[in-house]
């Protein structure tokens, strides 16, 4: 009996001023009731007799006299067990209002009871500062937490902390002691129930007590033990007592050092949560290449902020940007401040916010900005292998070219409008991005302009931004790589310190396919600049030398040609044309006479050409040069130099010009030398002059009408084009080299078929023309002084060689025309 009594007493002696913890912690658990029990209670409450008995029981319990009898009986029973029981009845004091974990509202009743010990104080020294003061010991008692409703019938929590009435009286007289009582009560609630109270936003409503006062019990061991406890234990003196280890040594207790409590913040950070919102898009569940590119990125962000002490959003300020949310409330008793960084860039213009007055919760819905989603056409694009800057041209109609040029100009204007200088130099480069310097860049100078070429491909025009200063420029842009991952570049350029007078007036930045062109317009000439400074920013600069310096071309003075007079005389009786050229010196006249004699002999030899060569018709067209056209209208009497007899059949005219030593102007008309051994293009004006000019009668090409006396009136400057448009169609699944090989095989097969169809006589003519062609090509490798009309401008006295040369050229001309026609048919 004695052992069980001792264990029972020890069970209730763990604390002097503590109540039953198990009862407190289990108070919030829900009632476990079965369905049958609920049905029986419902049926019983439906009976009038049961309700009458139930109300009588409630009145009996609430009767103070009956409660006094109940407390006396409980005290007597506990005293028999050796435990003193004291019932504490809280007396109203004041109320503190706050919140639990930033979610639920709660009230703390600071009450008084004479059963609680009085507060005690003693003189003490602060170990940190050395100041003398009073150290208070304030006893207290706590009751179990209970649920209640506030003025708006919303659920809340209520806690009771009971002090001695003298402590409450001191709190009314001294504000510091009152604050000490409040801090002690808050610490007790947080320690006992393991919750976090909002100490920043404390309110003091005009209430003495929240709810109905409920008594609590304090249990402690009785000072007068019972008779059973006074009896000695039978085994107590059977064995000697064991001496203690520290017996005889003084006990040294460590000095208690009170840690300074951190200052309470002025604002409380409310509890919040960020939720990702996704829409059900059926296109993301397909097998397309671009179906799941944006699956991991949400459509919107939903931010929920718990504000239990606010009644509406009019009491707070909310600022939302593309990357953050800032909330501030300066209302007394509800001071909140929250600065939240968002994980994604949002559209703050399209967001919406709503405050739930029932739950005291602020809901913010912000749509997420998604980058440009690459479509299936861009993902499936493959490299065609053709360079962007190819010299090959394809025949396109003029209307399509005009439309393309207009679209290109509009795109350039849009790019120029998008590239605007940024007006925030300190934060120009974003700290969250990694920038790198272009691997290769060049600088060229021209008058007062510095042009930089940054060799970076696939630059997005809308990403170009720059900051312009007087003597420096900071540029940044982004390039899209093969994996659709942007690479950011930065380029900082500054003028050298030697050229202190130079200032940047204007800046132009333009993105191309393979590079970025940066143009700086200076206030003075840039010829004296020898180097420049470049790097990622102004802290990382290196000196680079300038290798490319150019000067603007000055207009060359126009040299007036000496006018040469040409006089034409036509004989109607005999088809002949007499040409007289004046303004030549004696040497040039002698050279011209010798050349005309050789040309006359050559014309006589051409009359004996074969009928096959006469029957063929050349489609080429020739016209007089510009210098000859200018000098044709003038006529001065002079001695005739040569007279040429012309046949009445079709004629061909050539302009033979002696090349001068210095020519400063070149015409726009180009010619192809088909009689020379090497392929070259030159201007007709290179050989044109006002002094030597002659007209040769030869076989016509069939396209130019015979010139009469109208030559002396005016000479038209015309350029003729073929009406037939050649076009080539390329298949998407084949390469250009493969089509070229296929066309070459087709031409070879056609050539072999033509050779098989040739007769014996035609084969002989073909072999003879081929031999003449080979012989002429060998001859041209040694002599390169022939004009495109076939005339030899040098003075050769060998008449036989001139005649053979003319035959070879005529035969070669018609063979080349046949080859050109065959190639045209193959292309078509």
Curated annotation (Swiss-Prot):
The modification Phosphoserine is found at residues 384, 759. Residues 9-22, 606-620, 741-755 have a biased composition (Basic residues). It holds the Pfam family PIH1. Residues 395-414, 591-601, 815-828 have a biased composition (Acidic residues). Keywords: Cytoplasm, Phosphoprotein. Residues 625-641 have a biased composition (Polar residues). GO terms for cellular component: cytoplasm. One of its GO terms (biological process) is cilium-dependent cell motility. Residues 1-31, 223-250, 383-424, 556-668, 741-828 are annotated as: Disordered. Residues 556-573, 788-808 have a biased composition (Basic and acidic residues). This is Protein kintoun. It comes from Drosophila willistoni (Fruit fly).
